[in-house]
C-alpha cells in the first residue's frame, strides 16, 4: 500500500490510529484519517466495502442454497414430525441470519432494524432447539423420570458444587431458555427505539448511551441460556446419545453464542481505537459492517455443518421402509409438511409447560404416579386376564387354555408337528411328531413330554430322558452323538 492524496481509493494514513477516537465523534466525515484495503482481483477504483458486499453475497447465496435443499428434503421425507418440525425451523435460521446480515452490510444506516428481526428469530430457534432435545429424550415425563433417577452430578464450570436433579429440573431449564426468548427481542426493540432518538450509539460504552446497557443485559441473558444448555446436555446425555447431539449443540453455539461474543469483541476493539475508518465510515460503522460480513461467511460454514448435524437420510430410510408411507411421502405431502412445521401450536404448549411444569408424583401423597401411555381410540382392546383366550365361535365364551385338552389338541398340533417346515431340516430335530401314542391315520397325539425330559433336552442330558414316550422308529433316525446343539435348540423352540 502507498500513501496518496485523499482522493485515492487505496491508502493508509498512519495518524488514523492515533486520532481514531476523534473520528468516532465526527463520524469520519471530511476526515483524511481513512484506511482503504486493496482487495485482490479487483480494480483499484472499487471501494473495499463494495468488495466486501460482493464476497458476502456469494457466501449468502451458497448458504441459502444448501439450507433450502436440506429443508426441502426434510419436508419431502416428513416421516417424524415430532423431530423434523423443529429441524426445519432450526435450519431456516441460516438463510434468515445470512440475508439480514447482508442487508445490514448494504444498508448500514438501518442495520439496527434488521437486527431486530434477526435477533427475534435467533431467540426463537434457541427455544426450538431445546424443544427438539426434549423430543429426542422421549418427552417430558420420560426425561423427568430420568432426571429423578440420575445420580448426583457436578455443575459445569465455573460452579463445581454437587447437584441432584429433581422433578423441577426440566421446568427450570425451560424457564432458563424462555428468559432469553423474551429478553433478546425486548432489548433489541428498545435499541431500535433509542436509535431513533440518537441515544443508541453502536459500539459506544458510554453510560449515557443505550448500547452499554444492551450489551450488558444480553450478555447476562445469553450466558444463562448457554449454561442451561450445557447443564441440560450433561444431565440428559444418556437419553440424547443415540441422536449424536454434539454437532447439533455446536451449530447452535456458533450461531447464537459465538456470533454474539464476536460482536462484543469487535466493539471492544473499536472502543480501544483498534478499528480504523474505512471508505468514509467511522470506526463504529466499520465494526458493525465487519461483524455482518463475518456472519455472512460463518453462515456458509454452519450451513455445511447442518448437512451432518441434521441429515435427512435417516428419515428417508424410515419412509422407504414402510410401504404405505412411500406413496404418501413421494406424491404430495410437502405442502402439508410445510403447514405442520409452520404451525405454532407446539410452541404454545412448550410455553405453557414452562410455567406449569411436569410432575411424575402425586402432589398430595408424594407417591410415584408412573408414566401414562397415550391412548389411541382406534387401538382399544378389551382387557382379559392372563391365560384366558376368546373362543373363535363365541366371543362371550372364555376357555381356560391350561386345562382344556381340546384347545391343546386343536391349537398346538400344527405348530408342534412342524417346527421346521423346510425339506432340508435335519432328521434329528425333535418335534412333537415323534411322540408315541399315535392316533388314526398315523397322526401322532400331542401329549406333552414331562418337564424333566424337556429340560434334559435343553441341556443335552440324554441319560435322564425317558425315551419310552417317543416313537421308536423316529428315535432310530436320531443321532445323539452329533449335532447336540441342534437338538437343544429344537427343544427350546
UniProtKB/Swiss-Prot annotation:
This is Transmembrane protein 184 homolog DDB_G0284525. Glycans are attached at residues 415-416. The lineage of its organism: Eukaryota, Amoebozoa, Evosea, Eumycetozoa, Dictyostelia. Probable transporter. Residues 1-10 have a biased composition (Polar residues). Its main location: membrane. The keyword tRNA-binding does not apply. It is found in: Cell membrane. Pfam families: Solute_trans_a (PF03619). One of its GO terms (cellular component) is plasma membrane. One of its GO terms (molecular function) is transmembrane transporter activity. It is a multi-pass membrane protein. The chain crosses the membrane at residues 46-66, 87-107, 119-139, 180-200, 212-232, 254-274, 293-313. Keywords: Cell membrane, Glycoprotein, Membrane, Transmembrane, Transmembrane helix, Transport. Belongs to the TMEM184 family.
